A protein has these predicted regions:
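Interfacial loop-to-transmembrane junctions
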Residues: 144-166
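Short helical (or helix-break) motifs at transmembrane helix termini and adjacent helical loops
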Residues: 60-81, 139-143
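Juxtamembrane helix-capping/reentrant segments at transmembrane boundaries
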Residues: 12-30, 84-96, 153-161
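Core segments of transmembrane alpha-helices
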Residues: 26-38, 99-113, 164-169
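Hydrophobic alpha-helical segments and helix pairs
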Residues: 13-67
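Single conserved hydrophobic/aromatic residue that forms the stacking wall/gate
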Residues: 1-11
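Helix-coil boundary and interhelical linker segments in multi-pass alpha-helical membrane proteins
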Residues: 38-56, 113-129, 171-178
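Glycine/small-residue-rich hydrophobic helix-like segments
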Residues: 109-151
Protein backbone atom coordinates (compact mmCIF):
# COMPACT_ATOMS: atom_id res chain seq x y z
CA UNK A 1 0.00 0.00 0.00
CA UNK A 2 2.88 2.34 0.74
CA UNK A 3 4.28 1.78 -2.74
CA UNK A 4 0.95 2.69 -4.34
CA UNK A 5 0.83 5.88 -2.30
CA UNK A 6 4.37 6.68 -3.40
CA UNK A 7 3.41 6.01 -7.00
CA UNK A 8 0.38 8.27 -6.55
CA UNK A 9 2.71 10.98 -5.26
CA UNK A 10 4.85 10.59 -8.38
CA UNK A 11 1.80 11.00 -10.65
CA UNK A 12 0.64 14.00 -8.62
CA UNK A 13 4.06 15.64 -8.93
CA UNK A 14 4.07 14.96 -12.69
CA UNK A 15 0.63 16.56 -13.04
CA UNK A 16 1.70 19.52 -10.92
CA UNK A 17 4.82 19.94 -13.06
CA UNK A 18 2.48 20.26 -16.05
CA UNK A 19 0.39 22.85 -14.23
CA UNK A 20 -2.28 20.24 -13.44
CA UNK A 21 -2.76 19.46 -17.12
CA UNK A 22 -3.23 15.92 -18.32
CA UNK A 23 -0.43 14.15 -20.14
CA UNK A 24 -0.44 11.71 -23.05
CA UNK A 25 -0.93 8.75 -20.71
CA UNK A 26 -4.30 10.21 -19.71
CA UNK A 27 -5.37 10.43 -23.34
CA UNK A 28 -4.37 6.83 -24.06
CA UNK A 29 -6.03 5.56 -20.91
CA UNK A 30 -9.24 7.29 -21.88
CA UNK A 31 -9.29 6.81 -25.65
CA UNK A 32 -7.28 3.68 -26.52
CA UNK A 33 -10.29 1.36 -26.66
CA UNK A 34 -12.33 3.77 -28.77
CA UNK A 35 -9.35 4.45 -31.05
CA UNK A 36 -8.75 0.72 -31.53
CA UNK A 37 -12.41 0.16 -32.42
CA UNK A 38 -12.30 3.13 -34.82
CA UNK A 39 -9.29 1.56 -36.56
CA UNK A 40 -11.15 -1.74 -36.87
CA UNK A 41 -14.19 0.06 -38.29
CA UNK A 42 -11.98 1.98 -40.74
CA UNK A 43 -10.32 -1.27 -41.81
CA UNK A 44 -13.72 -2.71 -42.68
CA UNK A 45 -13.88 -5.27 -39.88
CA UNK A 46 -17.40 -6.64 -39.49
CA UNK A 47 -19.88 -6.45 -37.92
CA UNK A 48 -19.50 -2.69 -38.28
CA UNK A 49 -22.66 -1.82 -36.31
CA UNK A 50 -21.41 -3.84 -33.34
CA UNK A 51 -18.03 -2.07 -33.41
CA UNK A 52 -19.78 1.31 -33.57
CA UNK A 53 -21.83 0.45 -30.49
CA UNK A 54 -18.65 -0.52 -28.62
CA UNK A 55 -17.02 2.72 -29.78
CA UNK A 56 -19.99 4.79 -28.60
CA UNK A 57 -20.18 2.98 -25.25
CA UNK A 58 -16.47 3.49 -24.55
CA UNK A 59 -16.79 7.25 -24.98
CA UNK A 60 -20.13 7.42 -23.14
CA UNK A 61 -18.42 5.74 -20.18
CA UNK A 62 -15.45 8.09 -20.35
CA UNK A 63 -17.59 11.23 -20.38
CA UNK A 64 -19.72 9.75 -17.59
CA UNK A 65 -16.57 9.23 -15.53
CA UNK A 66 -15.27 12.73 -16.24
CA UNK A 67 -18.58 14.41 -15.39
CA UNK A 68 -19.04 12.29 -12.28
CA UNK A 69 -15.51 12.84 -10.99
CA UNK A 70 -15.31 16.55 -11.60
CA UNK A 71 -18.83 17.46 -10.52
CA UNK A 72 -18.80 14.98 -7.65
CA UNK A 73 -15.55 16.40 -6.26
CA UNK A 74 -16.74 19.97 -6.62
CA UNK A 75 -20.42 19.76 -5.70
CA UNK A 76 -20.88 16.41 -3.96
CA UNK A 77 -22.43 17.11 -0.57
CA UNK A 78 -21.84 13.67 0.90
CA UNK A 79 -19.23 11.36 -0.56
CA UNK A 80 -19.44 7.67 0.33
CA UNK A 81 -17.35 4.63 -0.50
CA UNK A 82 -19.22 2.58 -3.10
CA UNK A 83 -18.51 -0.68 -1.26
CA UNK A 84 -19.67 0.25 2.24
CA UNK A 85 -21.50 3.58 1.89
CA UNK A 86 -19.15 4.88 4.61
CA UNK A 87 -18.63 8.66 4.40
CA UNK A 88 -15.19 9.50 2.95
CA UNK A 89 -13.48 12.69 1.71
CA UNK A 90 -14.18 13.79 -1.88
CA UNK A 91 -11.55 12.44 -4.27
CA UNK A 92 -11.10 9.14 -2.38
CA UNK A 93 -10.66 6.21 -4.79
CA UNK A 94 -14.02 4.46 -5.02
CA UNK A 95 -15.97 7.40 -3.60
CA UNK A 96 -19.32 8.36 -5.09
CA UNK A 97 -21.91 11.02 -4.36
CA UNK A 98 -25.48 11.54 -5.48
CA UNK A 99 -24.43 14.66 -7.39
CA UNK A 100 -21.52 12.87 -9.05
CA UNK A 101 -23.64 9.86 -9.96
CA UNK A 102 -26.31 12.08 -11.52
CA UNK A 103 -23.55 13.92 -13.40
CA UNK A 104 -22.22 10.56 -14.61
CA UNK A 105 -25.65 9.70 -15.97
CA UNK A 106 -25.79 13.11 -17.67
CA UNK A 107 -22.35 12.56 -19.22
CA UNK A 108 -23.33 9.17 -20.58
CA UNK A 109 -26.58 10.57 -21.95
CA UNK A 110 -24.84 13.57 -23.54
CA UNK A 111 -22.21 11.49 -25.33
CA UNK A 112 -24.79 8.96 -26.48
CA UNK A 113 -26.96 11.75 -27.92
CA UNK A 114 -23.93 13.05 -29.84
CA UNK A 115 -23.27 9.54 -31.16
CA UNK A 116 -26.95 9.20 -32.09
CA UNK A 117 -26.91 12.56 -33.90
CA UNK A 118 -23.81 11.46 -35.82
CA UNK A 119 -25.63 8.21 -36.70
CA UNK A 120 -22.96 6.14 -34.97
CA UNK A 121 -25.68 4.60 -32.81
CA UNK A 122 -28.42 3.12 -35.03
CA UNK A 123 -31.59 3.61 -32.96
CA UNK A 124 -33.11 4.91 -29.74
CA UNK A 125 -33.25 1.44 -28.11
CA UNK A 126 -29.54 0.97 -28.80
CA UNK A 127 -28.90 4.49 -27.51
CA UNK A 128 -30.65 3.54 -24.27
CA UNK A 129 -28.35 0.53 -23.98
CA UNK A 130 -25.25 2.67 -24.58
CA UNK A 131 -26.40 5.22 -21.98
CA UNK A 132 -26.96 2.51 -19.38
CA UNK A 133 -23.67 0.75 -20.11
CA UNK A 134 -21.79 4.06 -19.82
CA UNK A 135 -23.15 4.57 -16.32
CA UNK A 136 -22.65 0.94 -15.26
CA UNK A 137 -19.01 0.99 -16.40
CA UNK A 138 -18.45 4.19 -14.44
CA UNK A 139 -19.85 2.64 -11.27
CA UNK A 140 -17.71 -0.45 -11.93
CA UNK A 141 -14.66 1.81 -12.17
CA UNK A 142 -15.51 3.23 -8.73
CA UNK A 143 -15.83 -0.31 -7.42
CA UNK A 144 -12.43 -1.21 -8.86
CA UNK A 145 -10.95 1.92 -7.30
CA UNK A 146 -12.41 1.07 -3.90
CA UNK A 147 -11.42 -2.59 -3.90
CA UNK A 148 -8.09 -2.76 -5.68
CA UNK A 149 -6.47 0.47 -6.84
CA UNK A 150 -4.78 1.50 -3.58
CA UNK A 151 -3.48 -2.05 -3.06
CA UNK A 152 -1.88 -2.57 -6.48
CA UNK A 153 0.98 -0.17 -7.25
CA UNK A 154 0.91 -0.62 -11.03
CA UNK A 155 -2.87 -0.05 -11.30
CA UNK A 156 -2.71 3.60 -12.31
CA UNK A 157 -5.67 5.87 -12.94
CA UNK A 158 -4.90 5.62 -16.65
CA UNK A 159 -5.09 1.83 -16.60
CA UNK A 160 -8.31 1.95 -14.59
CA UNK A 161 -9.72 4.35 -17.20
CA UNK A 162 -8.72 1.96 -19.98
CA UNK A 163 -10.37 -0.94 -18.15
CA UNK A 164 -13.52 1.13 -17.68
CA UNK A 165 -13.81 1.96 -21.38
CA UNK A 166 -12.99 -1.65 -22.31
CA UNK A 167 -15.73 -2.90 -19.99
CA UNK A 168 -18.22 -0.47 -21.52
CA UNK A 169 -17.35 -1.47 -25.09
CA UNK A 170 -17.38 -5.21 -24.42
CA UNK A 171 -20.55 -5.09 -22.34
CA UNK A 172 -22.42 -3.06 -24.96
CA UNK A 173 -21.27 -5.35 -27.75
CA UNK A 174 -22.23 -8.49 -25.80
CA UNK A 175 -25.66 -7.09 -24.92
CA UNK A 176 -26.23 -6.22 -28.58
CA UNK A 177 -25.73 -9.87 -29.42
CA UNK A 178 -28.49 -11.04 -27.04
Amino acid sequence: MTSSRGLGDVYKRQAEARGGQRGPENVWGSAAVGAFLALLIGAGVEPRELMLVGFAASFAAKLADTFGSEIGKRFGRTTVLITSLRVVPPGTEGAISLEGTLASAAGSIAMTLVMLALQLVPSWPVAGLVMLVGLVATLAESLLGALVQDRVAWLSNELVNALQTLLAAVLAMLLMEL
